A protein has these predicted regions:
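Membrane-embedded helix-loop-helix hairpins and adjacent transmembrane boundary segments
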Residues: 1-471
Length: 471
């Protein structure tokens, strides 16, 4: 039996396992939008924590983060440190209030929550929905690109075929049971993701001759790879780290992740959910960095004659028996699908609930919206010429800058008028885009920092003008 047949057999075996979980979850579903979009707010903290981990740690961790670390070395650790701290702060100050407010207002989407109590004006929910579909759709496309790259590296498939396979699997998950199927499969996929990453890490370090030998070889390849401080930072290390901390806090602008807080069975269980998520986050992120550094030692030619974003699957092929390569590929694809299905469900919710609120309670139209969004995402993935890291990172910053500030203020029950809300969303995204594309400063300070600051400043200015009018 050829290696490719063995790899494909194990890969398909795990896909069937995930599909079986999704199909079983469908037996627990109810045919209404509340169950399709929020699982009737009945998910226990263990499932929620595992699902949040799998959704947040997408194919980007297997592909883009490893590819980036492969290029820059140990200094990439600050991206993950800052991201974790910001994310953890958000869990303390935003997730629990979001769970409480979403139930108080009986809202099923982020857009509906943002627009709650504003009668006769749907501008906030419509603009937030458009932002979600555009940028979260692009983010979902980045996941499909990651899946396409993995299948290309292992089987030699055309990128487009791998992308289409990923899209078909995502649609099947979404149609089987909505967010309940997504969460249940996330839980199983998170175990496969963690196991595959840790297994490859251990084998790679042993092959390098141990941590000490790996570190010495990295220094010989390029001394900057073992320099913990990034070079050429225009604004210094402090602002660089702060920008990535704010990037982590930018999770509050990611509907597909924040909805995990909304599905939790009780706000009282948020602390347990947060701790499960955080422990898995730290272990998995550290393992990903270790795998990337080992890959730079074992397959150094990807910088000149390959794609650094393919470091993980390429190293798996070189180091592991065919069956284990199938497991690694399943772990990578798990990360892709667990995020993409959540993103597509959030986009379809924005389309069916916020842009066309007259269809809000139609279960069939919610499913049709899912299919429509998947086709759009597939088109973006097939026509994009960006690498996954660039596409995913800018989509995250746009969502964090556009939706983050207004969501924070909403769950803290601050009054926001339609004009101010729309200005905050558009202003934040514009500033982030200018910082990235026009000024070219994202390498020194990630654009989500100025983008989110702009959103909060716009709100602050609106309060000053309101006080002046009262005076």
């Amino acid at each position: 039996m050829s290696n490719q047949v063995i790899i494909a057999s194990f890969f398909i075996l795990f896909l069937l396992l995930f599909a079986g979980v999704g199909i079983y979850s469908a037996t627990q579903k109810q045919s209404n939008t509340g169950d399709y979009l929020l699982a009737n707010r009945s998910v226990n903290p263990w499932l929620t924590g595992l699902s949040a981990f799998a959704t947040a740690h997408s194919g980007g961790m297997f592909i883009s983060t490893i590819g980036w670390t492969y290029q820059v070395g140990i200094s990439s650790v600050w991206l993950l440190v800052g991201w974790f701290l910001g994310d953890y702060i958000a869990w303390f100050f935003v997730h629990k209030p979001l769970r409480e407010v979403s139930e108080e207002t009986n809202t099923e989407t982020i857009g509906a929550l943002l627009n709650h109590n504003i009668k006769g004006n749907q501008s906030i929910s419509i603009i937030s929905a458009i932002i979600t579909i555009l940028f979260l759709g692009a983010y979902a496309a980045a996941q499909l690109i990651a899946g396409g790259k993995a299948l290309h590296a292992v089987f030699g498939w055309n990128y487009a075929l791998g992308i289409i396979v990923g899209a078909v699997i995502v649609v099947l998950y979404c149609f089987s049971g909505g967010i309940r199927a997504s969460i249940w499969t996330d839980a199983v996929q998170s175990v496969v993701m963690m196991f595959s990453m840790l297994m490859l890490l251990i084998i790679a370090i042993v092959t390098c001759g141990g941590l000490g030998e790996m570190w010495t070889t990295l220094a010989q390849i390029d001394p900057t790879l073992v320099n913990p401080i990034p070079a050429n930072l225009q604004f210094g290390f402090g602002l660089f780290l702060l920008s990535w901390l704010v990037a982590g806090f930018g999770v509050v602008g990611q509907p597909h992740i924040m909805v995990r807080a909304m599905v939790l069975d009780s706000p009282k269980n948020m602390a347990l959910t947060r701790n499960i998520y955080a422990i898995l986050y730290v272990i998995f992120s550290a393992a990903a960095i270790g795998v990337a550094l080992a890959a730079r030692v074992l397959i150094p030619d990807l910088m000149n004659n390959g794609d650094p974003e393919l470091a993980l699957p390429q190293m798996a092929i070189q180091l592991l028996p065919a069956a284990w390569v199938g497991v690694i590929l399943a772990g990578l694809f798990s990360a892709v699908v667990s995020t993409a299905d959540s993103q597509i469900l959030s986009c379809s919710a924005a389309l069916s609930q916020d842009i066309f609120p007259q269809t809000a309670h139609s279960y069939k139209l919610a499913k049709f919206a899912t299919l429509t969004v998947t086709i759009i995402v597939l088109a973006i993935a097939l026509t994009s010429n960006k690498n996954m890291f660039a596409l995913g990172v800018f989509a995250w910053s746009a969502l964090g800058s556009g939706l983050g500030p207004i969501l924070v203020l909403r769950v803290w029950k601050c009054p926001i008028s339609p004009v101010v809300g729309v200005t905050m969303m558009i202003g934040g995204i514009v500033i982030a885009a200018v910082w990235n594309a026009v000024l070219g400063l994202s390498g020194s300070i990630y654009e989500v920092l100025p983008g989110m600051i702009a959103g909060f400043l716009i709100y602050g200015c609106s309060l000053l003008f309101r006080e002046k009018e009262k005076a």
